[in-house]
């Protein structure tokens, strides 16, 4: 896939298919450590221990109908090509956590891509609540790592946080798919993502 956001959308959809009612997506760009970490945690049915060794096998599926899932093997291959890895932990009845790591500056690492489109697509699908956290630690200025100090504690991070459960609570009976809410949500996510790259 040309963008990591497409891998993320695929993993989010896997969570929905596993019966999740809440998914937590974390994207951490640690520029000082030259690391990009993507983590998706859900409260779905989980994966049986005897099936876990096969989740990254492109020739294995537990499905009896529909397509064979290549999303996880492709994500793992993308991570490994960038000096990273992909791992899954899961517990029946509790949920599943997928973690993928990449060398942030690796030449072969696909760009994060259209996170706004990915998030809007998933959120407006309405299948479950999503908490999204995107954190960038440090920044590169002319090829050198610079700090983002706020003068108080010299924090070197920026973070955008979006939780649809909190938004739904504020909206009451108004659905996220309402045209005005949808427009606000797109603007909120777009502006939140933009704050992570501002100098």
Identify the role of each PLM range.
Residues 47-58:
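Short conserved segment of the HATPase_c
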Residues 104-199:
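N-terminal assembly/transducer modules of large multi-domain enzymes
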Residues 28-38:
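Short beta-strand-loop-beta element adjacent to the nucleotide/active-site pocket used for signaling
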Residues 74-84:
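Conserved glycine-/histidine-rich ATP-lid loop and adjacent helix of the Bergerat-fold HATPase_c
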Residues 94-96:
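Glycine-rich GHKL/ HATPase_c ATP-binding element in histidine kinases
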Residues 88-92:
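A short beta-strand-to-loop motif within the catalytic HATPase_c
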Residues 1-28, 78:
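Conserved ATP-binding N-box helix of the HATPase_c
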């Amino acid at each position: 896939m040309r963008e990591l956001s497409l891998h993320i959308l695929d993993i989010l959809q896997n969570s929905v298919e596993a019966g999740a009612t809440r998914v937590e997506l974390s994207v951490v760009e640690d520029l000082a450590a030259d690391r990009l970490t993507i983590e998706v945690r859900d409260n779905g049915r989980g994966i049986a221990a005897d099936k876990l060794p096969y989740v990254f096998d492109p020739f294995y599926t537990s499905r009896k109908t529909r397509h064979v899932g290549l999303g996880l093997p492709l994500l793992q291959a993308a991570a490994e090509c960038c000096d990273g890895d992909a791992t899954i932990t899961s517990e029946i009845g509790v949920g599943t956590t997928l973690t993928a790591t990449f060398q942030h500056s690796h030449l072969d690492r696909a760009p994060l891509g259209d996170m706004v489109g990915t998030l809007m697509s998933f959120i407006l699908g309405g299948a479950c609540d999503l908490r999204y956290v995107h954190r960038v630690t440090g920044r590169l200025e002319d090829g050198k790592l610079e700090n983002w100090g706020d003068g108080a504690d010299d924090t070197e991070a920026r973070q955008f946080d979006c939780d649809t459960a909190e938004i739904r609570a504020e909206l009451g009976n108004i659905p996220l798919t309402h045209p005005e809410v949808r427009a606000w949500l797109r603007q909120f996510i777009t502006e939140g993502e933009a704050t992570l790259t501002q100098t």
